[in-house]
Amino acid sequence: MSQIIRDMTEIARCGAQYKADRLSPMGLKGCHASYLTEICAHPGISQDQLAKRICINKSNVARQAATLEEEGFLTRTPSATDKRIMELHPTQKTLDLLPEISSVLKEWETCITGDLTAEELDLMAALVAKMKSRATDYMDGR
């Protein structure tokens, strides 16, 4: 494995632990931040659409959505056009917590990028976007 991939993987693992530590007092797991921020940004998103947007397999999304529903963070309702499709909506509980969740994500970003210059941040953002595009192209082609 290349050093770049190792480093990116390690950063992702550290970020997951950071989110888990900060979100657990809210009753959330670290992985739930990406689910809830997307659901709040796109109320009514289907489980399949969410899986594609956050690059998680459909069965994991279904499992986590069920957990989040049980805990009162979202509702799952069958689509009016296709009862097999489950649409996800944030609850008021989630909407109330969204600023805190967003703050945790911003804190992590600041933690790992705080000593980078504006030019370094711009370059990194462009390079990461390029890599993400290739990664999502792979996922779309599966």
Locate the predicted segments by residue:
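Short, locally clustered residues in the helix-turn-helix/winged-helix DNA-binding domain
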Residues: 9, 37-41, 102, 129
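Key DNA-contact positions within bacterial/archaeal DNA-binding proteins
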Residues: 31-33, 59
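Central "turn" residue of the DNA-binding helix-turn-helix
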Residues: 43-44, 55, 117
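Residues within helix-turn-helix
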Residues: 47-48, 59, 66, 86
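The alpha-helix within a helix-turn-helix
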Residues: 51
